[in-house]
Amino acid sequence: MIILFIHASDFSFNVKERAIKEPEEAKLKSIELKNTLVCFTTVEKGDDEEILSKAIDDILDVYSKVKADSVVIYPYAHLSSNLANPDTAIKILESLENLLKDKVKVYRAPFGWYKAFSISCYGHPLSELSRRIRKTEELEKSEELKYCEKFGFPSSSESAFMRRATIGYLRNLFQPLFESENNENVRDGEMSILYQNVESGRILPCINENPRIVVVYGGVRELNFPKEINDSKNRIRVWWVNESKIYVDVGRLIYYFILESVKQQPPTLPDWLNPIQVRLLPVKKDFLDFSIQVAERLRKEGIRVNIDDLDDSLGNKIRRAGTDWIPFVIVIGEREVKTNTLTVKIRARNEQKSMTVEELVKEIKDEVKERQNLPLYYTLYRHKNN
């Protein structure tokens, strides 16, 4: 349902002739009113009792705000192309009138007739309003999304940063390896590289939102994808070296080594790839200004830094930094402000060290070397990123 509200100082209409074969009976053929709220109303397909309830609430809301003396329900089919059939529209308009009768003085123009009308609008800020009234829709979570939540992980600004950083680094790394030897015209399909991702182990999207059409030129190789994919989970590749069998590409061993490495030290990302290289944790708000000064010095050196200035306990701030895999975590307290030195927790070595700002900058730059000049995508304060 769509309603156009006009708060009119003067409004009148006169019924002229039939607009459809079977209009409703024209009980009210003419009217003249002052200070009335005219509701030009279009009934759409699917409108029901829920729509009526919302429409009444909207009409009464506008009526009370503009302080009109009466309400006019005026059928108006020109606000939508998705019109309900005449019988349904008449029933809904009648119900709308009957439900409003007990609350306000209401008049309803007949449906299915051509009418001449005259209107004079007050022109104040609330004198012209429109409302589109829809049914409440219950949203269901798709089965595909359930699998994505179970096996996938949410994309974030951090992942976008890491993807761009990695692509940029690899492009610079491999660019010198490519040379153009022959610029002769080669048609599509005559020179191509075919490969399979059956055992690549790379992370693939859970839902392919952009399926592609691939043209394969026949007669080159018979591809047995269904058979190979189904059998890949049971495949063990065997390499023969000096007449002895060596088993490689065994998933269980890979997982074992990963788990063992996790037990030895916390998981880390290379410093050059980490979206945030340094996080400052002020113990309380009194140390926020000093934290900002330190952060600005680090930013000027190209270090990606932010401040966890949330009104929270220090323990929670340290846990958040650990969850985010921050390489260098610095707690800012009274000692740091007085001595102008930093107590830095280094994640990769699981150690705590006292440093000056200059020493911290040197350590990070020595680690990332030429890969340090990546874009600074992040604002200074952590709460502005959430």
Curated annotation (Swiss-Prot):
Assembly information from the UniProt record: Probably interacts with its catalytic subunit (AC Q97VW8); a subunit fusion (in the order edit-catalytic) is fully functional.
Localisation: Cytoplasm
Biological-process GO terms, alphabetical: translation
Major subcellular location class: cytoplasm
Top-level taxonomy: Archaea, Thermoproteota, Thermoprotei, Sulfolobales, Sulfolobaceae
Family of this protein: Belongs to the class-II aminoacyl-tRNA synthetase family. Archaea-specific ThrRS editing domain subfamily.
Record gene name: thrS-ed
Record keywords: Cytoplasm, Protein biosynthesis
Cysteine-cysteine disulfides: none
Protein name per Swiss-Prot or TrEMBL: Threonine--tRNA ligase editing subunit
Record organism: Saccharolobus solfataricus (strain ATCC 35092 / DSM 1617 / JCM 11322 / P2)
Cellular component GO terms held in the UniProt record: cytoplasm
Listed CDD domains: ThrRS_anticodon (cd00860)
Transmembrane segments: none
Knockout mutant characteristics: Not essential, however growth is severely inhibited in the presence of 0.5 mM L-serine, but not in the presence of 0.5 mM L-ser plus 0.5 mM L-threonine.
GO molecular function, one term: aminoacyl-tRNA deacylase activity
InterPro entries hit by this protein: Anticodon-bd, Anticodon-bd_dom_sf, DTD-like_sf, Threonyl-tRNA_syn_edit_dom_arc, ThrRS_anticodon
SUPFAM superfamilies for this protein: Class II aaRS ABD-related
Function: Freestanding tRNA editing subunit of threonine--tRNA ligase, the catalytic subunit is AC Q97VW8. Deacylates (edits) mischarged L-seryl-tRNA(Thr) in trans, removing L-serine, has no aminoacylation activity. In vitro when both subunits are present, or if the 2 subunits are fused, L-seryl-tRNA(Thr) is no longer produced. Has no activity on correctly acylated L-seryl-tRNA(Ser) or L-threonyl-tRNA(Thr). Editing is probably catalyzed by the 2'-OH of A76 of tRNA(Thr).
